[in-house]
């Protein structure tokens, strides 16, 4: 089983964190997105986006990979046991772009927006699954874009950084 991955990519970070949380043995194949290889475009057409799981079949998209790993490797569980809470966690992931993604990328491009306000309004700490979906962007906002995190979000991130999977992602981001 291979995970096609790019260190800078927060979507890939989701998959890396889940792999670490679940202790999955996997071969990571790192690609340089500024020089995207043709084999990646062929594997995941039309643009060759990452992450991609190659396990005898091709599975793109971080949300789908996260869900696949959660079902394939049920322990330790990242989703809550309660059906309603699991649905809420999935809803947070479904609404990612609306809740954070669009504003993060606009801020990164230099557009005037309220990224700090979006960060402040995040619903975090309810589900590790949803937290894993959001934390790569929060780490990058702080460590790559120099955003001062709202106190509640900084505290949430500090708690998550105690997890080896998140600490490893912070270390990776700081090395870029």
Language-model-detected regions and their locations in the chain:
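Phosphate-coordinating loops and pocket residues in cytosolic domains that bind phosphorylated ligands
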Residues: 42, 162, 171
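GST-like fold's C-terminal all-alpha helical module
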Residues: 84, 92-165
């Amino acid at each position: 089983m291979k995970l096609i991955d790019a260190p800078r990519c927060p979507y890939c970070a989701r998959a890396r964190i889940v792999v670490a949380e679940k202790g999955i043995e996997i071969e990571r194949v790192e690609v340089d997105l500024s020089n995207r290889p043709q084999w990646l475009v062929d594997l995941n057409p039309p643009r060759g986006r990452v992450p991609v799981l190659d396990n005898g079949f091709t599975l793109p998209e971080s949300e789908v990979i996260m869900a696949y790993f959660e079902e394939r490797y049920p322990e330790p569980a990242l989703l809550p046991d309660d059906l309603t809470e699991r649905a809420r966690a999935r809803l947070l992931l479904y609404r990612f772009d609306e809740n954070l993604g669009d504003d993060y990328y606009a801020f990164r491009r230099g557009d005037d927006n309220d990224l700090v306000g979006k960060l402040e309004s995040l619903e975090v700490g309810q589900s590790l699954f949803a937290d894993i979906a959001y934390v790569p962007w929060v780490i990058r906002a702080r460590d790559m874009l120099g955003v001062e995190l709202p106190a509640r979000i900084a505290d949430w991130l500090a708690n998550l950084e105690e997890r080896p999977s998140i600490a490893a992602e912070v270390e990776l981001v700081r090395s870029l």
